[in-house]
């Protein structure tokens, strides 16, 4: 028993040390990435270079309490979520951003109740080791936005041919739609996200993105829109920031190579771009 207690204490201290290190270190890979197959296209961007539209949409849709909540999660909501799960009902709230990030960094995909409880414990450790801004920055850099595509830097260049500081509201809504099922998201040959209902993946993304285009603006209207960004202590606009090493203002080479490898003939590319505008 004493041996087990020592092991648990060592694991707890190691986890705390890892979370504290995230104040200075950008993790090159996460447990969630290792669960996937293939490459991990993952280029980092500092939060100050991310469009305020994307930041506001992410907070409003994923965790509107993030700017003001002291704890990693809302424990009342967590208990209701646990009760719903034990009664075989759907999740009434969804996981807040610190819980999602802690899971992505260290844990494995599972619906096991014990694993879910571990999510919550790690979320509490995380928010007391790093700032809320840093939590959001890491979340946006580690979230999956497509097969092998991780982080908003790679996502904006891959889908929209633009840096993350030039995203529009509509770009943000579309990426919010990709988050629930990123393995089905693909780039159109001329740019944009494939939402062609004639293909299985396109049909899935069409439904998810159209839903996000309805619900994310509603969430923003309820929760304060860009005021959420200011509540996080983020001021100014992203594209007015001076260039820096983590600005992601140049297309990453691995994304350029991926686009080139998947490029279709010019005629098909033109048709795809026209289709994107037709359904936007």
PLM region spans:
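Juxtamembrane regions of bacterial inner-membrane/periplasmic proteins
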Residues: 1-280
């Amino acid at each position: 028993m004493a041996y087990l207690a020592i092991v648990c204490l060592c694991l707890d201290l190691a986890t705390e040390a890892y979370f504290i290190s995230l104040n200075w270190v950008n993790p090159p890979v996460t447990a969630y990435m290792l669960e996937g197959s293939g490459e991990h296209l993952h280029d980092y961007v500092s939060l100050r270079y991310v469009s305020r539209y994307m930041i506001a949409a992410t907070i409003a849709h994923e965790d509107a309490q993030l700017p003001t909540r002291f704890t990693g999660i809302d424990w009342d909501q967590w208990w209701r979520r646990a009760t719903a799960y034990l009664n075989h009902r759907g999740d009434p709230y969804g996981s807040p951003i610190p819980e999602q990030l802690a899971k992505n960094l260290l844990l494995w995909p599972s619906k096991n109740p014990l694993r879910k409880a571990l999510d919550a414990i790690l979320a509490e450790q995380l928010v007391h080791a790093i700032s809320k801004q840093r939590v959001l920055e890491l979340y946006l850099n580690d979230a999956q936005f497509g097969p092998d595509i991780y982080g908003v830097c790679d996502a904006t260049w891959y889908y929209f041919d633009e840096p993350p500081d030039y995203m529009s509201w509509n770009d943000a809504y579309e990426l919010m739609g990709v988050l629930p099922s990123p393995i089905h998201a693909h780039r159109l040959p001329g740019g944009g996200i494939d939402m062609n209902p004639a293909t299985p993946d396109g049909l899935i993304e069409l439904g998810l993105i159209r839903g996000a285009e309805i619900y994310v603006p509603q969430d923003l209207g309820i929760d304060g829109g860009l005021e959420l960004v200011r509540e996080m202590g983020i001021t100014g606009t992203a594209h007015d920031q001076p260039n820096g090493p983590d600005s992601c203002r140049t297309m990453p080479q691995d994304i350029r190579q991926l686009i080139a490898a998947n490029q279709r003939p010019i005629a098909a590319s033109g048709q795809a771009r026209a289709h994107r505008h037709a359904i936007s």
